[in-house]
């Protein structure tokens, strides 16, 4: 570095140091002059009857918390106060051109503006921040403060709720004749607002009021800011509403599960237990208040009733499903309603037994073993045809007897054997009680054959009774299936309409 550069650098440093010293001395002289005889307890007015005009503005930095249980809104605010103090004026030319000076706020007179609806903490802001003083006496004081204001909340539509929280600022001791508040702007300053993850500020207008209280004759001005906030429902939708919807649809699946699997009640109890555990987990999330029932609370109660009714109905369906002819007799109206009318309405088609569809003109066994949905007129027709066929069998075996008696010569056993062998196909095809009785009555057979025929008759009667019992059991099972299908659609409609009805209420209330 050459000598010229060194001289230039030294000259600049000297000028800066000298100017700083002069500025410090000028500011010190100004401070001593301003506060030599200043009294911070006296209102800064030349005429005692004149009010001090205080311009007031609120800037919100952060919406810290909204406590629904205690009904408190916690905010971080910057309060801008602007007023003029005639005793704090100076000429900048006399003090090295100083136009602004920062002074401790406890050294000057300050308006005692407090938050009227403060819930917790101090009503006054702290005086640790400095005030900006201008040469013409204008004072700007912007103290930051964290307020916990009381806010009556309506959580009826939680978590889709809107809240209106007000903050009322005003002088606590000075009436309008002493301090006149002027609102800066028409709403809260949101330029430095940090977005909250739970709440959104829709609007925050400000209003000035002049109120006469019962305690005093004077009129007191105040500035009230109304914070219109909306809860962001994404967190509650994912953690509350969607699990409840899934549990509700699991309840619907109970009615689609077949009764024979034996897991219907198990599924119902599992859904109820899962809902109970879920309610225990989210108890701290839901606002615990007895003033109103929140929307999510109504939906959880709706889901609980939903699951409980599904258990009751499932027990009833299982009771119907496992009924037998030995314990219950099916009334005719049940057969008409649940076996004929309702299946058509519910678009249910009962499969027809193959034996019935393949041999409609067969014997009584085939007719009685069919599992078709309608057993009224068709069953009667089958029974009448079976009785006619029994009479035909009697006639046929009667002719066989006459033929046997018409035989002459030889052992009587041979004609009997031939007659039996000749009619064997008919007996095997139409094994009815009439046919068996005809064989036993009009045939001269050995005791062994009679015993065999009686055994066949017993087996046929047993098979017939079992088939009839099986038919009745199948009818009861089909009735249970119809009831299941009815409640399946009923629960689907109730679940969809109930969900839409509950969660459309906030939207309807907002537009109304």
UniProtKB/Swiss-Prot annotation:
Swiss-Prot/TrEMBL keywords: Cell membrane, Disulfide bond, Endoplasmic reticulum, Glycoprotein, Golgi apparatus, Ion channel, Ion transport, Ligand-gated ion channel, Membrane, Metal-binding, Receptor, Signal, Sodium, Synapse, Transmembrane, Transmembrane helix, Transport
Subcellular localization(s) per the UniProt record: Synaptic cell membrane; Cell membrane; Endoplasmic reticulum; Golgi apparatus
PROSITE patterns: NEUROTR_ION_CHANNEL (PS00236)
Spans traversing the lipid bilayer: 243-258, 261-277, 300-318, 483-501
Positions on the Cytoplasmic side per record topology: 259-260, 319-482
GO molecular function list: acetylcholine receptor activity; acetylcholine-gated monoatomic cation-selective channel activity
Residues spanning the signal sequence: 1-23
Extracellular side: 24-242, 278-299, 502-512
Gly residues composition-biased segments: 359-376
Binding-site list for Na(+): 263
A GO term from the CC aspect: endoplasmic reticulum
SUPFAM superfamilies in the cross-refs: Neurotransmitter-gated ion-channel transmembrane pore (SSF90112), Nicotinic receptor ligand binding domain-like (SSF63712)
Cystine residue pairs: 151-165, 215-216
NCBIfam families according to UniProt: LIC
Subunit (UniProt): Neuronal AChR is composed of two different types of subunits: alpha and beta. CHRNA3/Alpha-3 subunit can be combined to CHRNB2/beta-2 or CHRNB4/beta-4 to give rise to functional receptors.
Family of the protein in this entry: Belongs to the ligand-gated ion channel (TC 1.A.9) family. Acetylcholine receptor (TC 1.A.9.1) subfamily. Alpha-3/CHRNA3 sub-subfamily.
The protein's name: Neuronal acetylcholine receptor subunit alpha-3
Encoding gene per record: chrna3
